[in-house]
């Protein structure tokens, strides 16, 4: 096709650009015209609306100011001696003289009429009400309508002269000596034909006229009749306002006591300045259109001459480059874009060649194996790293037939088929010999078709070996943790079983020994057992914390219960030791808190027990305070535990919360302890999302500060708990089945139960228990865990599932693990008691049994 044919078929780029620019400028001009017209109209309307709003606000302010001044005069008058004296001695001459002087002093702010009332009815009126058709009967009606408050009241009243719209307000007249309300002082502002009020609003708002409406009815106006409009036309323009009307109408609704009323005020102003502004706007738009048209023609001529020459030079260079002749440089152009296009064409082939060489170098020198496969699964190319891993020295057919390559190809083929369908695969593990490689397969998409597949590999043999070692170490750690947990559970059971006997016998001896020296020895036995139990519990708790098995269960509880528990436990202990124990509580006793009560009690027991242990003399103080912070959903329970004990050396404060750490070895020998108490406290506080800190001075004492977030619940009336004597707890003797293989534990439990007038039958294993239950009915079953023949958990399940008995079962086990407790409860037990069982603990459980399960026969 010749150049002439091309020119006839296609337009010149210069001509096309010129036409496009001319078209764009035309569209821009039209757009600017439309936008200018739109925004100018909008600005005019906004200006009109702003003027209306300002006028409306000014009218409302003037009206409210008028009422405010009347209200001030009204309240001031009600306190005047002349009015009070009138109620006392009836001197109406002085009263009328007083009101006359007030009206003369400020005639602008004078009500239309006034009247006074007492509880018996109308007492006095100024006589002005009759001018508005309001007689004494209507005055009584007004006073009955305005019975409460001292605010303005709007009312429409049918009078002798027709319907009157008015504002009424009352103010009490009080005897300053006795404080007695003598009566009520009423004032009224009649809105109908209130020309002084209308003139005041007209002059104050700089309006031409004012019209006052009630609904759509005109009740007062300032029109003289010489205006180019009448009331009907004003109301019509009010309903269909326009920014370009001859007059501007602002309607102001009147609110009384922040309540909408039917009263509204129309302010009419001249609108000639808006019409003038509109004419100037149209003239400016016409001028802009003419200027834009002239500018467009000038730009069209300049572009057509300027662009055509530069474009022809670029076209000549592109035609020369397209012939494939010798490479030459572009001569350049004055137009930046054309120069850029020319230089881009100049560098295209050089860049393509450079890219080809760079890609080949990247492929050949990469340390990771790389391959290119066809979509049909044939190897096209591989880099030296891949040849090395596959044992290929030369890309010959003999090398590709070696078993290592064939096995690799066989394992890679399924993934190549997926990639050939367009899927991008990552993280595919395919080994080469003894090494494991992770491969990424990516299809090469050209013109919506797949021309090949790039395969890249990475040696992850070391990573796989490390992962295997990590899994092995994890399994060994889990087995070690399980072994330790099983060991602690076994030791807990083995220690708690004889400890139950020691503490049980000690408690029985305490009630039967009368000799002071023997009682002292029994106390030593009790204290030693309690100490051993505390150490055991600390070790188990610490083990649970390490394993992450300590659960937080938040619920609502009465804070008084915690205070009562601390008071009952530690005051006798401190009294016996000769140490003062004080609780300073700033929280209401009936306050409900939402947190984990069990863990909170455990924290307090550990801290106060430490204070008792390390305070040989002096005092221990515990304080509680509940703080609420702004913008926080939680309150902060602040706790402070102080003692005057041996204190802690400053160098030991940083490590005092670490496990198995005490202030010094001398303290450990003298006071004992496991060194886990404060560690458990710190972990529990952190689990409750709180903070703990300590201040201490050696030989002077220590203070622990705790801050725990809690939610404050509803307060409820505190009920004083009753604690009946054992023999009075049940009205008749209970029949109890005791399942226990240990003779000592059975002896102790039977002795405890006999205090409650219980009839106890003892069996030594689960099988015997089932036989007994088939023959006799019992009120309560006390079930041990580890029993010969049939264990306690299995026996409990048989009682529930086979015998179908609902008899309450209280499990008594020396295994303190949470898993054992859950197994018992899942089998059907009602409660789980952990040995050693103390007398008070058994009493509490029997109280629970009576409250939830006991039915008197």
From Swiss-Prot:
CDD domains: HATPase_EvgS-ArcB-TorS-like (cd16922), HisKA (cd00082), REC_hyHK_CKI1_RcsC-like (cd17546). The keyword Lipid metabolism does not apply. It is a multi-pass membrane protein. Residues 735-850 form the Response regulatory domain. One of its GO terms (molecular function) is ATP binding. Pfam families: HATPase_c, HisKA, LuxQ-periplasm, Response_reg. It catalyses: ATP + protein L-histidine = ADP + protein N-phospho-L-histidine. Its main location: membrane. It comes from the Bacteria. NCBIfam families: LuxQ_Vibrio. This is Autoinducer 2 sensor kinase/phosphatase LuxQ. It comes from Vibrio vulnificus (strain CMCP6). The gene is luxQ.
